[in-house]
Amino acid sequence: MQFSRVEPRSQLALSFLFICCSIKPALAHDHFNPLSLENDEPGVENVDLSVFEKGGQAEGTYNVDIYINNTSVETKNIAFKNKKSADNKLSLQPCLSVEQLKQWGVKTENFPELKNDPNGCTDLSLLAGAVAKFNVIGNRLDLAIPQIALIADPREFVPTSEWDEGINAFLLNYSFTGSQDHDIDENRTENSEYANLRPGINIGAWRFRNYSTWNHDSDGQNSWDSAYTYVSRDIEFLKGQLIAGENNTPADVFDSISFKGVQISSDDDMLPDSMKGFAPVIRGVAKSSAQVTVEQNGYTIYKTNVPAGPFAINDLYPTGGSGDLYVTIKESDGSEQHFIVPYASVPVLQREGHLKYDLTVGRTRSSDTHSAQQNFAELTALYGLAGGITAYGGIESTLSNDVYHAALIGTGLNLGDLGALSLDVTNSWSKIKAGDVVSDTLTGQSWRIRYSKDIQSTGTNFTVAGYRYSTKDYYALEDVLDTYSDNSHYDHVRNRTDLSLSQDIIYGSISLTLYNEDYWNDTHTTSLGIGYNNTRHNVSYGINYSYTLNADNSQDEDDDTEDSNDQQISINISIPLDAFMPSTYATYNMNSAKDGDTTHTVGLNGTALAQKNLSWSVQEGYSSQEKATSGNVSATYNGTYADINGGYSYDNHMRRLNYGVQGGVLLHRNGLTLSQPMDDTIILVKAPGAAGVPVNNETGVDTDFRGYAVVPYASPYHRNEVSLDTTGIRKNIELIDTSKTLVPTRGAVVRAEYKTNIGYKALMVLTRINNLPVPFGATVSSLTKPDNHSSFVGDAGQAWLTGLEKQGRLLVKWGPTAADRCQVSYRIPSSPSASGVEILHEQCQ
């Protein structure tokens, strides 16, 4: 229950009260006599207003945003007590435990005098210079703590003490799609259905996951398959994950392969964003207390204050690409130092001192039932050295025999103005199988080079990655396994080149992609793409060209494989129609292929409903080759309980009706909650009784009829803020707090619990048995719902109460003795007020 100002007369009385309480003392202590309230209310007795008289506020628990040195750290409930400061001023001070201070980065071990009192509170004044200021109106608690008492954590650092393993739960993601195809030429109708299920179980820090699929069609196919099954958990001290079951190896060093076994690998999501990816360490020396500013490509990307002496900045956000860093040190006397730190990056580069690792032991696996399997082990590591250098390498080997061994060593370099480069070499020792004959050990080498460069002055960015297998006897592990399979046809790659280039121009940008791969059997594949795209006045348009060639240059007369190539050019335009139809776009696409067929497609697409959770599309097309039209219409609804989609399409030969539903099921201690499709890490919203409340920034996610909802994705090991939108909620619902911050571990189901006040709202006029109003400032609390917040009595005995039951009893107190209290029995009328607020007159006895 909460106090609310309801009448002008009440507002005047309260204003007068607080003005009187805020007047500074002159020669004597000012005292506000509560009997002065008797002007309007004869018989009002002496009410204890000493706290307000001294400039204090009501003690209790407040939901506050906590800031340390102007940096937001958490939102939570904190208990406050009125305490006197050194200058004898009364103010609300927080009850903070030693554990909370440690969680927020205070070096509590350096201050042994910090201890919790019997109420679990410590004396913040024991930290020299520490000050707590509470803004009651803004619900903000500011803690000013000397820098020397704080751990120097990188930006957005989250201590492991905040990590939440979540609740025990059963999860199920499901997807079902179906279609009915009618072949006009053969007058035949076929039906097909597909489903996938992704069940999971969370128990403590352990996660069990499975992925299974089902296929059914009119030809009688009815099959279940399991794509993977594994259990996992995080290992905090290794900053990594343990996985046992079916998974894939990372592709940082060797090519990724599927396996069944055990894997321990680093998890970079455990790092704050400012420590992920690659960025150089900036070192310098400040002559005095100074401000350091870092700029890249004309933008300020970092600013901090440093004391006099040497400093190192190691928590720059990775910006991608390249572009030198311009550093300015502004001294306290206004003088400045300037220097440049070269910066560029390729995928393998790691921050100085950071180790990325993977250890896998298991058995290879493949969806191809004919593929051979081998026990194997793989170990890879990448380590960031000083000077923008990264050393990396790995070993990969079969265990039960000498079928395959490989070792790789390489280095990555930040070359500054010259870009970024990585170079590695792999040695392999292989025994391949030809027919029934296993070869002797074949030794081969492969060199790989990757390069990236961003030329800011011309707006050019390009990345080239070239693989060259220098000897014919080099094999990757999967190449060797292919020779042992029942279907022994495989392509033995000789070299591969990838090129990606983009160039900004006055209006838009031009892009170029090139992929070329050739094999030792003299076949090769080439793919080329060129495009121009631009957006002007919200109108997007572009033109793209693609070319693909599969060529066979071998001299094998028995091989009747023909060269094949394909060329396509397309034009696309998208125009917003907000002036006529909000959230709607008109589109046009033209596609012309080498065979002479040109298709033109026009359409409308957009979103609808208040939360934009209904997307729709209508298209009509024409083919010049067949001189026939085609079309389709589709819609997708993102609902609280599931996503539903459907569509219909047609052309000269086929009519197709398709439909689908995707969603999630979460079984937890408080029951069962349906949701949209869930990611691996999710948040359960618990607001008991608050039905139909939207979750901010989550399309279509509202609380269900019990007050529960699932936020279908969350960032593991990072702070996730979940807030509820209270605009338009039902009149009998009150949310005591609306925002929570949570830090889930990977795969966790964390619960965001909101305290609710469900019930009737009333403006209650309280009188005593002598028919005089209950004293101003008295507190009102529920005897039948003790969890409800207390309220205060205003002028003329008026109290604003929320969360009331149909009938109940209230306790009213205005002093410390038994004579200073009474009880009220009330009943809400059988026909509630249309406004949602009841006006009640009750006697307190």
Task: Label the predicted regions.
Residues 140-145, 347-351, 738-759, 826-845:
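Extracellular beta-sheet/turn segments enriched in Thr/Pro/Gly and aliphatic residues
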Residues 87-96, 316-322, 708-734, 746, ...:
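Short Pro-Gly-centered beta-turn/loop motif in secreted/extracellular proteins
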Residues 700-708, 785-798:
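Short, acidic Ser/Thr/Gly-rich low-complexity loop/linker segments typical of extracellular
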Residues 149, 178-182, 205, 214-218, ...:
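Transmembrane beta-strands of outer-membrane beta-barrel pores
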Residues 163, 191-204, 224-238, 373-387, ...:
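Feature captures outer-membrane beta-barrel proteins of Gram-negative bacteria and organelles
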Residues 66, 282-284, 683-687, 760-769:
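A short, amphipathic beta-strand motif
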Residues 2-8, 13-17, 25-276, 593-666:
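Post-signal-peptide, soluble extracytosolic/periplasmic N-terminal scaffold domains
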Residues 58-81, 689-699, 770-785:
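Short, ordered, surface-exposed loop/turn motifs in non-cytosolic proteins
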